[in-house]
Swiss-Prot record:
The keyword Metal-binding applies. InterPro entries: Endo/exonu/phosph_ase_sf, Endo/exonuclease/phosphatase, TDP2-like, UBA-like_sf. Its cofactor is Mg(2+); Mn(2+). DNA repair enzyme that can remove a variety of covalent adducts from DNA through hydrolysis of a 5'-phosphodiester bond, giving rise to DNA with a free 5' phosphate. Catalyzes the hydrolysis of dead-end complexes between DNA and the topoisomerase 2 (top2) active site tyrosine residue. Hydrolyzes 5'-phosphoglycolates on protruding 5' ends on DNA double-strand breaks (DSBs) due to DNA damage by radiation and free radicals. The active site is at 273 (proton donor/acceptor). Its EC number is 3.1.4.-. This is Tyrosyl-DNA phosphodiesterase 2. It comes from Xenopus tropicalis (Western clawed frog). Residues 131-135, 237-242, 275-277 are annotated as: Interaction with 5' end of substrate DNA.
Length: 373
């Protein structure tokens, strides 16, 4: 990955720890040179194999789930989605991704948000939503490894994913053993939630259908407890393309009603690929009074205005420039008790992989929430 300049290594407090971290950084460089991969990917394989170089190399080249990813043809999945990308109208064995021995080999963590790589803090939790573009079969295995590298780097407590395909799901189950993963479906393509086992207790889950979707879309809901707080999590991938605006707004209405109907003592967080254009939100009169768009709430930060940006992200090789805020996070506060408040918002996935492409045609949104008693 290449967005920032120097490599940054997470420093320990003693000389011995510093030596170990330096040795591991050198191992990452050596592994990356041998395997022809990113150093962040190298770190993942070394960590899962107890920093044994030979075992890690063997694991990297082991056939298995990645072969399924490589061989999966997405051409027969969701024709409307393929039209969106072309029309110009749209816009390894297990690894614990929350391990304490994370070596940060790029400086994105310190440049974009120094709080993203940290020990668990009960007064905060982190959240990532990302359309990972599983329908694009090009470089899908390397892009999947890239997504897992970001999960290892940021170690978010909650992850929402859109455009997950079955081989990608199997890959995540194999790699992200520190998360409970639930999905909105298990066929063709779907949404998923990843809940860090050490922080998030899953209470219940629900799939809310969209009656008139033609793209297999739905709303995935999970009621969880984080640090003693009841939180209702929701993710969705709303209907794609400009031509399906009417259906998209129907789906948005279902989402907003579901958020408003959640128990009053619960905090509600929705995140996903909404495919919304600003004029569509204006058309319905804006957001309900008790539901906030986190980007608006945080002062409309320019650095994360666009999450689908063909000016910078050339994955689609689009012959046009289109910069839109498709990916959004909505928030409804609880009416009593401790409050969960959005604190910061950053883009994820903005570094190219060695294949010359980004992990997805979308940027991810990484949000930090404070828990105020």
């Amino acid at each position: 990955m290449e967005k920032e300049d120097a490599g940054a290594v997470q420093c320990g407090t003693g000389e011995g720890e510093a030596v170990v971290l330096n040795e591991r950084s050198e191992q990452c460089s050596a592994f990356a040179s041998i395997a022809g991969c990113d150093e962040a990917v190298a770190q993942c394989f070394l960590a899962e194999n107890d920093w044994d170089m030979e075992r890690a190399i063997n694991s990297f080249f082991e056939p298995g789930v990645e072969s399924a990813l490589q061989n999966k043809a997405a051409a027969d999945i969701a024709d409307p989605l393929k039209q969106e990308t072309m029309s110009g109208t749209a816009s390894d064995s297990c690894i614990d991704l929350t391990g304490d021995d994370l070596v940060v080999t790029k400086s994105e963590a310190t440049t974009s948000n120094s709080s993203t790589v940290k020990q668990e803090d009960e007064s905060h939790f982190s959240f990532l939503t990302w359309n990972i573009d599983g329908l694009d079969e090009s470089n899908v295995a390397e892009r999947a490894r890239g997504v897992c590298s970001y999960l290892a780097l940021y170690s978010p407590d909650v992850v929402f994913l859109q455009e997950v395909i079955p081989p990608y799901y199997e890959y995540l189950k194999k790699r992200a053993v520190s998360y409970t993963i639930i999905t909105g479906n298990e066929d063709e393509y779907f949404t998923a939630m990843m809940l860090k086992k050490s922080r998030v207790k899953l209470i219940s889950q629900e799939i809310v259908p969209y009656p008139s979707t033609v793209m297999m879309r739905n709303l995935l809901v999970a009621n969880v407890n984080i640090s003693g707080n009841s939180i209702c999590l929701m993710t969705s991938h709303l209907e794609s393309t400009k031509d399906h605006s009417k259906e998209r707004l129907k789906q948005l209405d279902i989402v907003l009603k579901k958020m408003m109907d959640a128990p009053p003592l619960a905090t509600v967080i929705f995140g996903g690929d909404t495919n919304l254009r600003d004029q569509e939100v204006a058309k319905i009169g804006g957001m309900p009074n008790n539901i906030l768009d986190v980007w608006d709430f945080l002062g409309k930060p320019e650095h994360c205005r666009y999450t689908w940006d063909t000016k910078v992200n050339k994955n689609l090789r689009a012959p046009y420039i289109c910069r839109l805020r498709f990916d959004r996070i909505f928030f409804r506060a609880s009416q009593e008790g401790s409050q969960v408040i959005p604190q910061s918002l950053y883009l994820a996935g903005t570094e190219k992989l060695d294949c010359g492409r980004f992990p997805s045609d979308h940027w991810g949104l990484l949000c930090d929430f404070a828990i105020i008693l």
